[in-house]
């Protein structure tokens, strides 16, 4: 367990230990976890350049003003976009590619609490579009920029790391999966998608994390649908943590050497008194793809064994083929 005091102590020294001038993209960052993480990133880093994507210009203006107060040397650029649409994701990525030769950090937290299974204009289940398809598209489109960065290269996708569940291969989009199985299905899609991407980018580290129950509009909507105190994952609803604490925890995930890339110098530096490097999703230390829980630790042995079984069944390849087929259907281009 990485306790909050340890996280805060680590974050306090980012300004002196983390390279100055990091370039980052935060998707889904005009509210909730994304906004809190962007602000914490502005607070701790030196001369950051942070792009952030969302739908509300009003919210973005307030966030930019707050970030500029936190760090006057930073640059904060808002891109208004509906990233549930794959074609729009491509447009956003094209803007970043036109402006930047490299990217150090990609942070993905876009999501929506909808249980009526709406579909997008591109005929993808809205919840799945935000949780899986658009995130994988951002990663694959921006992977060359991440690989071009010197030193630190990391992707963090906020979801349900450690809670991977069975896949329904007849319903990858999760349009008809029972509600109680929906979460585990989508979480597995994300993790297996990251494993595929990582094979072609061993110099980039990939984290799929579970943020805990964070006090955000999305969380409150979910809890309200579940009748304010219904069981989640077989247990009682935990106390909500603040968005500010979540921001601190996620900046730690963005910068800590506990989660190194599989190859290269990336984060193989000294841990400086921190907890040790954790296990990747393949059960090996520091292997580059991490499914981690709220406490910053790797998934349980049972979950890692479950992922082994999925690999044996060829699920990594099946998830990727389905995802690429959807991209081709929508854009004419593979991931």
Task: Give the positions of each predicted feature.
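A glycine-rich helix->loop->beta "capping" turn
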Residues: 71-77, 94-108, 114-119
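Glycine-rich NAD(P)-binding loop of the Rossmann-fold in SDR/ketoreductase-type enzymes
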Residues: 84, 126-134, 185
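The beta1-alpha1 cofactor-binding region of Rossmann-like NAD(H)/NADP(H)-dependent oxidoreductases
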Residues: 80-91
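Amphipathic alpha-helical dimer-interface segment in Rossmann-like NAD(P)H-dependent oxidoreductases
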Residues: 132-150, 195-199
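Short alpha-helical oligomerization interface
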Residues: 113-131, 174-176
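Rossmann-fold scaffold of SDR-type NAD(P)-dependent oxidoreductases
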Residues: 27, 100-111, 156-159, 207-211
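Active-site loop of short-chain dehydrogenase/reductase
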Residues: 103, 146-167, 202-204
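NAD(P)H-dependent oxidoreductase Rossmann-fold/reductase module
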Residues: 1-79, 95, 170-335
């Amino acid at each position: 367990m990485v306790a909050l005091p340890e996280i805060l102590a680590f974050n306090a020294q980012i300004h002196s230990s983390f390279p100055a001038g990091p370039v980052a993209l935060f998707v889904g960052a005009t509210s909730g976890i994304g906004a809190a993480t962007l602000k914490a990133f502005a607070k701790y880093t030196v001369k950051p350049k942070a792009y952030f994507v969302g739908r509300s210009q009003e919210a973005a203006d307030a966030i930019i003003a707050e970030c500029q107060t936190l760090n006057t040397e930073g640059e904060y650029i808002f891109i208004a976009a509906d990233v549930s649409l794959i074609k729009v994701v491509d447009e956003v990525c094209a803007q970043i590619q036109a402006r930047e030769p490299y990217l150090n950090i990609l942070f993905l937290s876009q999501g929506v609490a909808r249980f009526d299974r709406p579909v997008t204009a591109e005929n993808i289940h809205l919840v799945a579009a935000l949780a899986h398809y658009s995130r994988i598209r951002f990663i694959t489109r921006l992977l060359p920029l991440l690989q071009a960065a010197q030193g630190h290269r990391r992707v963090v996708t906020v979801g349900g790391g450690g809670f991977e569940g069975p896949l329904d291969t007849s319903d990858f989009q999760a349009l008809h999966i029972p509600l109680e199985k929906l979460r585990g299905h989508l979480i597995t899609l994300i993790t297996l998608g990251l494993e595929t991407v990582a094979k072609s980018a061993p110099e980039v580290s990939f984290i799929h994390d579970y943020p805990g129950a964070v006090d955000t509009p999305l969380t409150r909507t979910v809890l309200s649908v579940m009748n304010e105190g219904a069981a989640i994952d077989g247990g009682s609803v935990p106390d909500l943590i603040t968005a500010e604490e979540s921001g601190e925890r996620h900046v730690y995930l963005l910068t800590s050497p506990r989660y190194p890339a599989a190859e290269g110098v990336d984060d193989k530096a000294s841990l400086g008194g921190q907890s040790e490097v954790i296990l990747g999703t393949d059960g090996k230390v520091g292997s580059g793809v991490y499914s981690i829980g709220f406490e910053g630790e790797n998934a349980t042995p049972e979950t890692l064994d479950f992922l082994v079984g999925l690999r044996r069944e060829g699920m990594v390849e099946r998830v990727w083929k389905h995802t690429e087929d959807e991209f081709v259907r929508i854009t004419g281009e593979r991931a």
